[in-house]
A protein has these predicted regions:
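Conserved SGNH/GDSL esterase-like catalytic core that processes O-acyl groups on lipids
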Residues: 1-72, 233-238
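A compositional signature for long Ser/Thr(±Pro)-rich, low-complexity
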Residues: 1-12, 18-21, 103-124, 183-186, ...
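Loop/turn elements at helix/coil->beta-strand transitions in domains of secreted/extracellular proteins
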Residues: 2-5, 32-38, 78-84, 159-167
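Active-site-proximal beta-strand/loop segments in catalytic clefts of secreted hydrolases
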Residues: 9-14, 40-45, 87-91, 169-174, ...
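Solvent-exposed, polar/charged alpha-helical surfaces in well-ordered, non-transmembrane soluble domains
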Residues: 21-24, 61, 65-72, 76, ...
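Sec-exported extracytoplasmic/periplasmic mature domains
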Residues: 24-28, 43, 72-80, 151, ...
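Serine-dependent acyl-ester chemistry module
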Residues: 46-61, 92-144
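Conserved catalytic region of serine esterases and O-acyltransferases that act on ester linkages
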Residues: 116-243
Length: 243
């Protein structure tokens, strides 16, 4: 019975060059457990760092090697019939476009907070949280080149893995924000106000909804069948608010 069988292996700042070591901790029994759905998302850490320029961004060839290595590890951990959804790196220009002229809770505008972080070499993403539009555009180009690697892996390497099928999902944050604004929301609500970098709880809700809609439309088999023990779970534990 898979009741609330959810595992979060998220580590802040995780990038492709280190993810394989993290996946060594995945705890599944390939012989006895039900198939799993793995949401494999590195967000933007392979292009985001505190260094000026692009020299510390992950090259596509290295990215490909490390992702294939990580997927090979997953193939030894997951029960047969599992699914892996590779989530694309974000176009982080939406951060500057949305937040730069807004006021940070501490008083200054976000663009000044970003500049302060850059000056002290502690900016979590020098490439996107930067007044230099050319650098922001180049960081997006680099992120897209890594997303192309994901697409190539799904298209050309799926046959190498016997225990799962793969899909690639590329979330469009600009579209998510526009939809939220059209419904009466404020674009700034989607970004975490304390750092002006990560998604807020609202942003996570929007992404979750979009991801679920993608699964329902494009990768239905990954959702699986309703738990056959749902009635017994309800009888034993009561109404848990939809969980």
């Amino acid at each position: 019975c898979n009741h609330r069988d959810f595992m979060n292996y998220g580590v802040n700042g995780m990038r492709s060059t280190a993810v394989n070591s993290l996946l060594q901790t995945v705890a599944r029994d390939p012989a006895l457990d039900h198939p799993a759905l793995v949401i494999f998302s590195l967000i933007g850490n392979d292009v985001c760092n505190g260094h000026p320029g692009t020299t510390h961004m992950t090259p596509p060839a290295v990215f490909k090697s490390k992702i294939l290595e990580a997927l090979a590890t997953l193939d030894t951990k997951l029960p047969q019939g599992s699914y892996v959804l590779l989530v694309g790196l974000v176009d982080g220009r939406v951060l500057w476009d949305t937040m730069a002229e807004r006021q940070h809770p501490l008083g200054p505008r976000y663009k000044d907070v970003y500049a302060y972080l850059n000056c002290n070499q502690v900016n979590p993403c020098h490439g996107f949280l930067n007044a230099n539009a050319s650098l922001r555009n180049e960081t997006t180009r680099w992120a897209r080149s890594l997303n192309e690697v994901y697409k190539q892996i799904v298209g050309n390497h799926s046959h190498k893995f016997s225990n799962f099928k793969m899909h690639f999902y590329d979330p469009d944050w600009q579209a998510l924000i526009q939809k939220y604004v059209q419904a009466g929301g404020d674009a700034g609500d989607v970004i975490e106000p304390s750092d002006g970098f990560h998604p807020s709880q609202t942003g996570n809700e929007l992404l979750s909804e979009a991801l679920w809609n993608y699964l329902e439309s494009n990768f239905t088999e990954a959702i699986g069948q309703p738990n056959e023990h749902n009635d017994a779970i309800m009888k034993t534990f009561g109404d848990q608010g939809g969980f």
